[in-house]
Design a protein with these regions (language model features):
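Active-site helix-to-loop segments that bind/position phosphate- or nucleotide-bearing substrates
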Residues: 3-184
Length: 185
C-alpha cells in the first residue's frame, strides 16, 4: 500500500518525512504523553529558573518564586499524575522538550534537532547559527532556543528613523511582535 498527498493539481507519492508528519499529527495530545523513567534531574536547572521568572512576571500574585522546583513544575503541568500507575507524578513529553537537558531529550527523541541559520546577504552560507549539540549553546531546549533566537532575530532588525503620517516616530515593536509570533509558531 502506498500513501499519496494532494499538491496543487495532482496527487503525488508521499515521502517518508511526510508520512512521519502525518502520523505525528494524527496522535492525540502527544505533548501530554507521560514519560517513564524521567525525573526532574532530566530537566535543565537554569531553564527551570528562567521559566519560573517568566511565569512570575505574568502572575506575580501566585508566588511562583517561593515554590520549590517540583511543586512549581507540577502546577505548570510539566509533571502530571499518572492515574494508571499509583498516581505517580511523571514528566510530560512537552515538559521534556521545553525544559529538558539535551541528553534527556535525545534519549527520548533521537532525531530532535533545533537549528537557526542567519544567512543575511548570502543564501549559500550562514553568518550565525544556533543549533542543538553546539558547545556554544549547552542544553539547548525549546525555551533556551526561543530566547536565544528571538534576541538574534531582533538584533537584525534595522531601525531607521522614520515618521508616520502623524509625525510620530515609527517603532520596530510591531515587527518584533510579528517575528516573535512567527518564531513561536
Amino acid at each position: 500500500s502506498q500513501t499519496y498527498i494532494r499538491k496543487n493539481s495532482g496527487d503525488y507519492l508521499a515521502t517518508p518525512e511526510e508520512i512521519s508528519r502525518f502520523m505525528r499529527n494524527a496522535s492525540d495530545n502527544i505533548d501530554a504523553e507521560l514519560l517513564e523513567n524521567y525525573t526532574i534531574d532530566d530537566l535543565d536547572k537554569e531553564s527551570i529558573l528562567i521559566f519560573k521568572e517568566l511565569v512570575n512576571i505574568r502572575r506575580p500574585d501566585e508566588n511562583f518564586l517561593e515554590m520549590d522546583p517540583f511543586t512549581f513544575l507540577k502546577k505548570m503541568g510539566v509533571f502530571r499524575i499518572d492515574r494508571t500507575d499509583a498516581r505517580k507524578y511523571k514528566l510530560t513529553l512537552a515538559g521534556l522538550i521545553f525544559l529538558g537537558t539535551e541528553e534527556a531529550i535525545a534519549s527520548r527523541l533521537p532525531h530532535f534537532h533545533l537549528d537557526f541559520l542567519n544567512k543575511k546577504g548570502n543564501p549559500d552560507r550562514w553568518i550565525d547559527r544556533v543549533s542543538s549539540n553546539d558547545l556554544n549553546y549547552p542544553n539547548l531546549n525549546v525555551l533556551k532556543y526561543y530566547r536565544i533566537v528571538r534576541d538574534k532575530i531582533f538584533a537584525t532588525i534595522d531601525d531607521p528613523f522614520e515618521l508616520d503620517k502623524d509625525a510620530i516616530r515609527k517603532s520596530k515593536t510591531e515587527l518584533q511582535v510579528v517575528l516573535r509570533e512567527a518564531l513561536v509558531n
